Regions:
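Active-site-proximal loop/helix segment associated with metal-binding centers of metalloenzymes
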Residues: 16, 126-213, 219-221
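Binuclear metal-ion centers of metallo-dependent hydrolases, dominated by the metallo-beta-lactamase
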Residues: 119-120, 207-314, 338-340
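Metal-dependent catalytic neighborhoods of phosphoester/phosphodiester hydrolases
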Residues: 69-77, 101, 266-276
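Conserved beta-strand hairpin/beta-sheet module of binuclear metal-dependent hydrolase folds
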Residues: 1-50, 83-85, 144-146, 153, ...
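Short, basic, low-complexity termini and linkers enriched in Ser/Thr/Gly/Pro
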Residues: 310-323, 331-332, 336
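A gly/proline- and charged-residue-enriched helix-loop-helix capping module
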Residues: 93-105, 114-117
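Active-site neighborhood of phospho(di)ester-bond hydrolases with catalytic His/Asp-centered motifs
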Residues: 35-38, 55-62, 91, 199-204, ...
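Active-site metal-binding motif and surrounding structural segment of the metallo-beta-lactamase
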Residues: 31, 39-89, 111-116
Length: 340
């Protein structure tokens, strides 16, 4: 079962020529789950992976850079004749916000459910679950954790034969949890194997809840709006520095840290250097890049660039990332973002 994250938008509060507003598309098997939907998200998708039939949408909070692309996306689905129901999840206030937005943009004909979540609520899905957790931003704001259920351990056919089971259907039945002629599954199966775990911080300043949610995650996608020189401003606006994101990743013992919500004030290269001083396996995805998360026995998460061939292994890191060109465009140096 594949699990990957497509970075549809990685900018901070203002888009740049190279980065669109926040949006992440999580792909697991046939499920397509969108986390946040900044202005322009539908074009980001149309120009790359296509305007997929989304399974669900999750909003982290209601600042405009994280949701303003949603009404247009819903209208496009409607114009294309979507019939499949769609559920949008978010913090309290979701229903009021989107009801008003659709009143202005025009209602849709397909079934649309607006679900306001509470911290700690567990949404069970086929083989995995999603849960919101509170983060420290301005107003109601969530991060999200997506974690897969445990998988059965590795089957030991030699042990099964020694216990009297015959190769064939009996092997299959005991692997599916059935006791066969006194042989119970635990006698022929190794310990359960963990599923994969993805954590999305949303906009936040450092907080304990994120550390708890991110513990032992395969991938932590954490905002990094500011460089360390502006950590005071980060605290004032409810955001994080790259170094603070790295500290969260290190304390939570995650496998990979991906920085996003990149402001035009700071080159991504600088943020990456600051973060790697505290957490080596840090990457800074660009728009349209993908991170694939394999099962742990199959290797480490890896970053794949949209406009490059096979990823290169950087010396001394577990991060499979090619060095991008300098991030800032002419005329954007140290631009004064209004932080949302």
């Amino acid at each position: 079962m594949d699990l990957s994250i497509f970075f549809a938008g990685t900018a901070g509060s203002i888009p740049t020529p190279r980065r669109g507003l926040p949006a992440l598309l999580v792909r697991r098997g046939g499920d397509r789950i969108l986390f946040d939907c900044g202005e322009g998200t539908q074009r980001q998708l149309v120009s790359t992976v296509g305007l997929t039939e989304l399974t669900e949408v999750f909003l982290t909070h209601f600042h405009a850079d994280h949701w303003l692309g949603l009404p247009g996306l819903l209208k496009t689905f409607d114009l294309r004749g979507r019939e499949r129901p769609l559920t949008i999840h978010g913090p309290p206030g979701l229903q009021e916000l989107l009801t008003l937005a659709l009143r202005l943009a025009g209602r849709v004909k397909f079934e649309l459910a607006l679900v306001e979540l509470a911290p700690g609520q567990l949404l069970e899905r086929d083989g995995y679950a999603i849960a919101p957790f509170p983060v420290a931003h301005r107003g109601a704001a969530f991060g999200y954790v997506l974690f897969e259920h445990e998988r059965p351990g590795v089957f030991d056919p030699e042990a099964a034969v020694c216990l009297g089971l015959a190769p064939g259907p009996e092997f299959g039945r005991v692997q599916h949890g059935e006791t066969i002629r006194g042989v119970i599954p635990s006698q022929v199966m190794g310990p359960p194997r963990p599923g994969r775990k993805l954590v999305i911080s949303g906009d936040t300043t450092p907080c304990a809840a994120l550390g708890v949610a991110a513990h032992d995650a395969d991938l932590l996608i954490h905002e990094a709006t500011f460089a360390d020189e502006e950590r005071d401003r980060a605290a004032q606006t409810g955001h994080s520095t790259a170094a603070q994101a790295a500290a969260a990743a290190r304390q939570a013992q995650v496998r990979m840290l991906a920085l996003t919500h990149i402001s035009s004030r700071h080159p991504a290269r600088l943020l990456r250097v600051e973060a790697r001083a505290g957490f080596t396996n840090t990457v800074t995805p660009r728009d349209f890049d993908t991170i694939e998360i394999p099962f742990r026995e199959n290797g480490e998460p890896r970053l794949l660039h949209w406009d490059a061939g096979a990823p290169e292994q950087e010396p001394g890191t577990g991060a499979r990332e090619q060095e991008p060109s300098p991030e800032q465009e002419p005329g954007t140096e140290r631009s004064a973002d209004t932080v949302a």
